[in-house]
């Protein structure tokens, strides 16, 4: 197989060391990822000069975005690091939030990987220039138009960033941020389940509806590490993969009796269900699967109220951006007050998740590396809107 190597455009970044110039691999077959590239931490003497402007994807209206030049580079606060973006990945929340509550001229995008080029004063004990990192930015932010990952630079609190282990490439790392944060917030903060470093002794079944999604992929693995027994739904073609991740059993969501089948398999014992899909059919399946004594249902999107058919089931939905501890001033139903308790949770969760990544205990979601850079992201989002992307995350080198 042929591969092409493209250097990132470094016209706005002056480096005192030539080895600091990042690069990306593109495969002639976009479904295949090349082996991880070696990365190096820069010596302390390395100096980065950052241009005042950058290219970024800006939201122009519902379903509309464009790549713009001359955009300001986000300011790096004492608690932040500034990252030169190498790769970005698309999530459903990117286009859903921009379609339903667009913040005009805000930078778009959530998941990224890249290299640290500025370290805020409060982060200097943990990060150095040139460190390889990944995370989830607060894109489409109505309060700060410079935030967002679909750009050449992103500023993000150091507490909300993972260092990339040596055996994970920038392309792979770009798929981690949103899924791992959402999985942790759902399982441990919202449902209150036992953490991986203190696994439960009395194993219980937990339903993950949508085990083929990126968040579902992480949830299945985290539940196993936490001592639970995950069962999941997905398409039949994904059965082998979700079982390899740790699912005790997989059920075809196309089956009209899916919920009843799960309830029978788990002997009427399920108390916890997570809905990674969130529509009337997925909610009905989860409510049917939850045992007769009731339980908790958590969705990753606003759920249809008409689907809340059981009084003994507590239903909630979460939005991952609450880990920033700031208000989410989007339109209803996405608008949220600041959740400082979620920020405190994130401060505890990220070090635990970092250890799991470092120890190789988490498999990452399948990805498809696309060409086209930032303009390609817009085209990929349009494909995702039309449900033309399944089972993989689209990744782009910037």
UniProtKB/Swiss-Prot annotation:
Entry annotated with the keyword Nucleotide-binding: yes
One GO MF term attached to the UniProt entry: nucleotide binding
Gene this chain is encoded by: lepG
Stated family: Belongs to the zinc-containing alcohol dehydrogenase family.
Subunit structure, interactors included: Monomer.
Name of protein: Trans-enoyl reductase lepG
Binding positions for NADP(+) per the UniProt entry: 93-96, 212-215, 235-238, 253, 300-301, 389-390
Organism: Aspergillus flavus (strain ATCC 200026 / FGSC A1120 / IAM 13836 / NRRL 3357 / JCM 12722 / SRRC 167)
This enzyme's EC code(s): 1.-.-.-
Entry keyword set: NADP, Nucleotide-binding, Oxidoreductase
Residues reported to bind substrate: 178-185, 320-324
